[in-house]
Amino acid sequence: MAIHRIVLFYAFAPVADPESVRLWQRALCEKHGLTGRILISRDGINATVGGELSAVKQYVKATKEYPAFNDIDVKWSEGSAADFPRLSVKVRDEIVSFGAPGELEVDQNGVVGGGTHLQPEELHELVAQKDVVFFDGRNAFEAQIGKFKNAVVPDVETTRDFIAELDSGKYDELKDQPIVTYCTGGIRCEVLSSLMVKRGFKEVYQLDGGIVRYGEKYRDAGLWEGSLYVFDKRMHLEFSDEAKTIGECSRCGAPTSDFHNCANLACRHLSLYCAECAASEDTLRCAGGCPAA
């Protein structure tokens, strides 16, 4: 039986002709039978693709041959092309949508003026030395099933909400404290940390490689607790059998890490449900009434 894998990677680097890169990436994925999502902009690439292991390896090798993408940090996980409904390769103003393409400055070394990168072991050293504030760089719902202990979780539905959230003043008291931003694979914090630095946060760090790299090293024996939300059919993954379940069913409060869409076709709001509540259309509905109904 063929072995399948999913890869996640990004690169912030000047791309002179994003449309040409889009055509090349699509042709490369089609050649190797891969599916997934790839975004390309003048500032780089953001990709998650899956397929047969040998095909994914060939794709990664070819992608790394492009000068701007020589040094991409490729994160591997279990999964396959079946975890993605199709192949999507698009050119966008941003490879991660903060709604601030004019604020981001990128050169051949990556994002200019971002937070200091920390390897997982360096994060532990920093935590031992200072009173660190963890700042979640993901959508708020992702933190319902997993986050760093005692992390600040901004009230954002999408990454586009972060600028208004930062400009609201509610985090100004943190501007003189050491802040470690983190996200799934590191890309959102590349942008978020630079936005925070520009807004006067004096000591900003970012977890290099994101939660994925941290989890690979420390599993569930470190500062992370819970499951990691992922944007494909898997919905979430765990780093070990010792993973703690911190999510709660929106209907009954039972422990769960499983997200489901509301059964109301006019709503479809994504919420946490335990297996029992998800099994019936009567309980697979928003507990407080559907906001879209």
Curated annotation (Swiss-Prot):
Any GO BP annotation: tRNA modification
Job description of the protein: Catalyzes oxygen-dependent 5-hydroxyuridine (ho5U) modification at position 34 in tRNAs.
Name of protein: tRNA uridine(34) hydroxylase
Originating organism: Renibacterium salmoninarum (strain ATCC 33209 / DSM 20767 / JCM 11484 / NBRC 15589 / NCIMB 2235)
Similarity comment: family membership: Belongs to the TrhO family.
EC number: 1.14.-.-
Keyword Oxidoreductase annotated: yes
Gene giving rise to this polypeptide: trhO
NCBIfam families: PRK00142.1-2
Keyword Oxidoreductase: yes
